[in-house]
Amino acid sequence: MAEKLKIIPLGGLNEIGKNMTAYEYGGEIIVVDCGMAFPGDDMYGIDCVIPDVSYLIKNKSRIRGLFITHGHEDHIGAIPYVLKQINMPIYCTRFTAGLIKLKLEEHQLVKSTKLITVEAGKSVRAGKFTVEFIHVNHSIADSVAFAIHTKMGTIVHTGDFKIDSTPIDGEVIDLARLGELGKEGVLCLCADSTNVERPGFTPSEKVVGATFMRQFQNCDERIIVTTFASNVHRVQQVLDAAAQCGRKVAVTGRSMENMMKVSTELGYMKVPKNTLVDINKLKGLPKNKQVIVTTGSQGEEMSALYRMAFSTHKQVEIGAGDKVILSASAVPGNEVTVGRVINELFRKGATVVYDRADMLHVSGHACQEELKIIHALTKPRFFVPLHGEQRMLQIHCQLAQQMGMDRNHIAIADNGGVIEITGKSMKLSANSVPAGEVYVDGSGVGDVGAVVMRDRKRLAEDGMVVVVLPIATQDGALLSPPEIITRGFMYVKESGDLMKELQNVAMNAADSVTGSRKRGRDDGELRGAVKSAVSSYLFKNTKRSPMVIPVVTRL
């Protein structure tokens, strides 16, 4: 039987976020990335969504390590939850390790976790795999791609990347090494598809710095800049522009403060002398000497910018003349919340700058021409598009074919799909592995399933009606009319007639149950009859379907 190498995406396909891929060869497994996704608008009460790792739990004795491409939440956010089920060593670059360590500390997992830092250009042996770290450019420092070497051949896993010829830290993507790998022979390329719909090249991060300088020089008031906390190169450019314009910078927002701490301690951010001040000291400075760097670029409720916009921030009150710069694009699904914050900022008299045309933000992902370069350099025999929704995966497939690849050598999979590669062929296995969504709600992981989510949706949309039935223990008779309690359905004091009708409907339903006046009346049967009758009545008369909960109390 021919030897097989398996590629098993557990997250990141047909979606944005939750990136996780398992590679299996010779009976051993390595895992690349372990990310989370933000909940959708209909996922009430959910903090985040993580991959289903039941396949990995079942095969944890065969796992040789977790390899992380970079420190964004969609690549590291699920690590604490997964580590509680699978104890495996983590390999990553130094800055990524600093961010992961913050998560491990929060979940008290530092002592039990083996966290190994690896420099770009170095390799790690993990069982039958040798994983080579290759520097790439992205919107976070210390990002890498992996060349995963096996006896069957080499897989290039790009992670998130772009080609930036003028990066802020001076470290360009290692195209030379990718070209060498192409000459040596690449069995399979697994590449980022996020920006495949965009033609051309992604602009350099450096252009944003020039925009900051123009904005700062043309403003005589306070400036507030919001961006992704993880984009230390973006924050570095804010600091540099402020220093050149003679302004002081204060930072607010927990994730921004944490990121500043890690990046400065590890040397990935250099704060100009006498530029950074505590936010409580800003009030003593003229407004034209102030810059605030804050979280909240996605309109997140309770983020620092959100609290400023809605006047609940303890230190900062937005006023007329303030210039607010949104140096980030709205993640798909966040447009409404971002718009709400922008509207409130305008309402307070602030000038809000957020147009993409002003080059206030550039993507961290490769556009079409950059992807073509990677395909041309690596010359893969097989190709698997990763990281994207279905249309992105399909368009990336088309791009690969334009580069000369045979369609039979390209696999578009779903999460849980098993891609099998021999030396000469690639196919999607008829068998898949579990790869659904696991919901994180507070300290609960996976204890909220489809039924609970359906109940939450119903409660959110139509509310709840509780019918309390006081029953005599002796003879099973109703002692008094049922008490009707509603939440999120309608205001009881203004719905007296409806409440009386509900009481009558509930009493009639209770009396209709077999043995209605007998001591042995079955509580379950009683609850069922009342629930059915009340639900039907409410829908008929209000066209709403609240959750109806009958409660039997025996006295």
Pin down the residues of each PLM region.
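Short glycine-rich phosphate-binding loop at a beta-alpha junction
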Residues: 89, 384, 549
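A glycine- and charged-residue-rich anion-binding loop/surface
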Residues: 13, 37-45, 62-63, 354-357, ...
